[in-house]
Structures are given as structure tokens and as C-alpha cells.
A protein has these predicted regions:
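Cap/insert and terminal regions of metallo-dependent hydrolase folds
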Residues: 89, 155-243
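Active-site HxH/HxHxD metal-binding segment of metal-dependent hydrolases
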Residues: 30-31, 47-111
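Catalytic core of the metallo-beta-lactamase
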Residues: 5-16, 110-170, 188
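Pre-active-site segment of Zn-dependent metallo-hydrolases
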Residues: 18-61, 72-75, 126, 154-166
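Active-site environment of divalent metal-dependent phosphoester hydrolases
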Residues: 27-29, 65-70, 91-94, 107-110, ...
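Structural motif
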Residues: 18-20, 58-59, 83, 146-148, ...
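Metallo-beta-lactamase
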Residues: 53, 86-145, 226-253
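Zn-dependent metallo-beta-lactamase
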Residues: 1-43, 222-226, 235-237, 243-245
Length: 254
């Protein structure tokens, strides 16, 4: 498989012969308001053009409708005929944008031999959870490919631990910028990401994303790497890609 981190949560995945676009946010640098007063968002430009991002895309996955996961520009530019998978409850809103092939991921579905399984997520805890709304993660599996657990916009909480324990994924993709809302954590921070490294199977690789793009983040790539080094996490265990970076990963024993 080939995975390209584009920016924040936006990923392009070549997997089992299908090109998948996950959580497209195409907004230009500083095109949206600040969350904290520190900087307009996004804080950086996309590393490649939207034409290049969309080239070859056959399936779109949208975890939830926050602007940094499916912004107005992406809603306009993503071809409306492409099959789009979303969380239950978002399908009618997405159809209102003109998309004609929208499927809510209630439990599991199969697309061209790729198995998608819905996983729970908590976009924060306590009073902030209602403000953030519902989100999903998912596992992605196909014969001959590494299994992926894409946790999505979630903190580390018992269902995430359970997913790791029961599915034993080859790859775990985390959102690790330590973003805060009302001084409460709404995605994983360095400590939680390193805990993921510890509880994951020995051969599982963790890919930390959703970093250095939004002004309510509290953890940079360097911060996370420093924390990993201080806790003796091997470099091959935790990957922290730059925007635009491409990773080539194989299934065990492939």
C-alpha cells in the first residue's frame, strides 16, 4: 500500500488496487478563522494541487463534517459521482452538497474487496464532547495488504484500546496534535500517542497525523518525536510524516 499524508487529517491511500481519499480539506492557508487567536486556519498550504490530490481517486471517506475534515472547497471540487462513505447521520447533509452515491457506514461494508469496519471514537471528554459531535474511526482490510486502524478524531479511551486489542492492526493512524477546546483535549496528545505505541502489538506501526495545521494544536511533530525518544519508542515503531510525504508499507510476510 501507498499512503500520502497531505495535510492535517487528509490522506490519499492506494490500497488493494483502489485509490481512497480520506477527509479532504482543500482550504488555502489562512482561509478560515482562528480557534484560539493564535493564527487563522489552516496554518499551512496543501503540499500539492487539488488536481493532483483528486487524480485517480475512486472512493472518498468522510469521518465527520468539521471543516478541517470536509471543507467547502472539497465539497465543491470532489467529483459528485464518486462513492462516498460517511458516518450515519451525515448522509443527507452530504447528499445536499450534490453527491449522488453516499453510504453511511453503520457497521461494515465491502468495496472492491476492501473491508471497512466502523469503529467508535470520542472527540473529547466531558462537556466538550457534545460540542464536538459524533465522529467515527474505521479499520480497513484487504487480502494481501496491511490492516489499518484509522482512529480518526478521538482521544484514547476504552473503545480505542479494545479495537487495538481485538483487531491487532498492522498500522494504526492517530490524530496526535493534542488539540484543545475549552482547555479540554479533543484528539490524542503526545502522552496518549505513546500509550498507543505501548499497547499496540509489537510489529504494529503507528503513523501520527493531524499535526501543525490548526492553531488549537498543542503538540508539534518535534514535540512528539522528543516525547517518543524520552520514552524509548523506536523510530520504526512511530512514524511522523511531513505534509506531502509518501509511505510505502507492506503486509507482514508479503
Amino acid at each position: 500500500m501507498k499512503l500520502q499524508l497531505l495535510r492535517n487529517a487528509t490522506l490519499k491511500l492506494d490500497y488493494a488496487g483502489t485509490t481512497i481519499l480520506i477527509d479532504p480539506d482543500f482550504g488555502s492557508k489562512h482561509s478560515r478563522p482562528s480557534f484560539t487567536g493564535r493564527s487563522p486556519n489552516p496554518m499551512v498550504e496543501l503540499p500539492v494541487s487539488t488536481d493532483e490530490i483528486l487524480a485517480g481517486v475512486e472512493l472518498v471517506i468522510v469521518s465527520h463534517l468539521h471543516a478541517d475534515h470536509f471543507d467547502k472547497i472539497a465539497q465543491e471540487l470532489v467529483p459528485k459521482h464518486l462513492p462516498l462513505v460517511c458516518q450515519p447521520g451525515d448522509e443527507e447533509k452530504i447528499r445536499s452538497f450534490g453527491f449522488t452515491d453516499v453510504t453511511p457506514l453503520t457497521e461494515r461494508l465491502t468495496y472492491e474487496g476492501i473491508r471497512l469496519i466502523r469503529r467508535d471514537g470520542n472527540h473529547g471528554s466531558g462537556p466538550v464532547l457534545e460540542k464536538m459531535g459524533n465522529v467515527i474511526g474505521l479499520t480497513i482490510e484487504a487480502d494481501g495488504e496491511p490492516s489499518i486502524y484509522w482512529a480518526g478524531d478521538t482521544i484514547l479511551y476504552p473503545p480505542v484500546r479494545e479495537t487495538i486489542a481485538t483487531s491487532a492492526p498492522d498500522i494504526i493512524i492517530t490524530h496526535s496534535c493534542g488539540a484543545e477546546w475549552d482547555d479540554l483535549l479533543i484528539v490524542m496528545d503526545a502522552e496518549q500517542t505513546i500509550e498507543i505505541c505501548r499497547i499496540a502489538p509489537e510489529d504494529t506501526r503507528i503513523i501520527a497525523t493531524h499535526m501543525e495545521a490548526l492553531d488549537h494544536a498543542t503538540v508539534s511533530r518535534d514535540d512528539l518525536q522528543d516525547y517518543a525518544n524520552a520514552h524509548d519508542i523506536a523510530k520504526h515503531k512511530l512514524l511522523i510524516p511531513s505534509d506531502g510525504e509518501v509511505l510505502h508499507l507492506s503486509a507482514p510476510n508479503a
